[in-house]
């Protein structure tokens, strides 16, 4: 009999609940969430608590988990070991690591032998995403585009952009579309130099106090256009410079002395030998001159 009821539920598609009974939930991509299911007023044997979901991409109804309400709490758990859905002890449905395809409508029902639905709870789950990329402005500046979006697409009028606790400073442009809010941030003007070099922390505040934080890198430091200041000379540098200069002068002076000495010695080696005075030749010449007289 329970199988027949399940088939009827499968063919019915979306639950036709009142708008007041549908709760909208937002979950950031990659995070976990829980969807409570109220306990039935009376626990009877054979009652089944079932969780269904209907993806955004189609109208089909998918069975997520089904447990008996009179079973011990310790026996509850994942319907599939590889599934990211888990039924907790209070019959809440836990979703681990949300993805885009998890967006859609979820609801829980309690079926008894009379095939009545009791205490159903319907949730419209939307997955929030945050993206950041770089763009070039018409002036050639490197700007950052910060995007906060929701799946399925719905208008996000309640998105607030903050830098720290204050509005975003500098030249910022805001854009809103169906299912997305975009902030274009360019380098700030008129900001002190030391402050402008720090990364900027910008937050996107979304419904139900969900938020994404972005870190916008500081603009690259332009190359210096002025000459670097001359280094300051202290006493130790001056003494070292004088010592090096004195050593250089001494080496040059010694080199000159050695070079002159070697040059003088080389000149003496190249000059012809002077003949020595010979007394006998001079005596002979004097005698010869005396005879001629």
UniProtKB/Swiss-Prot annotation:
Residues in the Extracellular compartment per record: 20-237
Positions of disulphide bridges: 37-108
Glycan attachment sites: 90
PTM text: N-glycosylated.
Presence of the UniProt keyword Lyase in the record: no
Subcellular location: Cell membrane
Annotated transmembrane regions: 238-258
Residue positions, PTM Phosphotyrosine: 284
Swiss-Prot/TrEMBL keywords: Cell membrane, Disulfide bond, Glycoprotein, Immunoglobulin domain, Membrane, Phosphoprotein, Signal, Transmembrane, Transmembrane helix
Subunit details: Homodimer; disulfide-linked. Interacts with GRB2 and GRB7 in a phosphorylation-dependent manner.
Record's protein name: Lymphocyte antigen 6 complex locus protein G6f
């Amino acid at each position: 009999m329970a199988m027949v009821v399940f088939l009827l539920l499968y063919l019915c598609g979306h639950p036709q609940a009142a708008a007041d009974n549908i709760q909208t939930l937002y979950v950031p991509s990659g995070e976990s969430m829980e969807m409570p299911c109220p306990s039935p007023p009376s626990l009877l044997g054979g009652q089944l608590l079932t969780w269904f979901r209907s993806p955004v991409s189609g109208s089909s109804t998918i069975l997520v988990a089904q447990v008996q309400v009179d079973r011990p709490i310790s026996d509850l758990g994942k319907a599939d070991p590889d599934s990211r859905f888990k039924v907790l002890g209070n019959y809440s449905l836990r979703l681990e690591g949300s993805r885009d395809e998890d967006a859609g409508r979820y609801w829980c029902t309690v079926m008894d032998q009379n095939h009545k639905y009791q205490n159903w709870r319907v949730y419209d789950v939307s997955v929030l995403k945050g993206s950041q990329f770089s763009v070039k402005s018409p002036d050639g500046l490197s700007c950052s585009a910060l995007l906060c979006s929701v799946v399925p697409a719905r208008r996000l009028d309640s998105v607030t952009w903050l830098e720290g606790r204050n509005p975003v400073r500098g030249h910022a442009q805001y854009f809103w579309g169906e299912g997305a809010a975009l902030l274009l941030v360019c380098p700030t003007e008129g900001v002190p130099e030391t402050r402008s070099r720090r990364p900027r922390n910008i937050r996107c505040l979304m419904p139900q106090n969900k938020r994404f934080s972005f870190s916008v890198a500081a603009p690259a430091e332009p190359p210096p256009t002025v000459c670097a200041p001359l280094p300051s000379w202290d006493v130790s540098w001056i003494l070292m410079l004088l010592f090096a200069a004195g050593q250089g002068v001494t080496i040059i002076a010694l080199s000159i002395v050695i070079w002159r000495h070697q040059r003088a010695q080389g000149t003496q080696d190249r000059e012809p030998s002077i003949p020595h005075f010979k007394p006998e030749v001079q005596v002979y010449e004097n005698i010869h001159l005396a005879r001629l007289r």
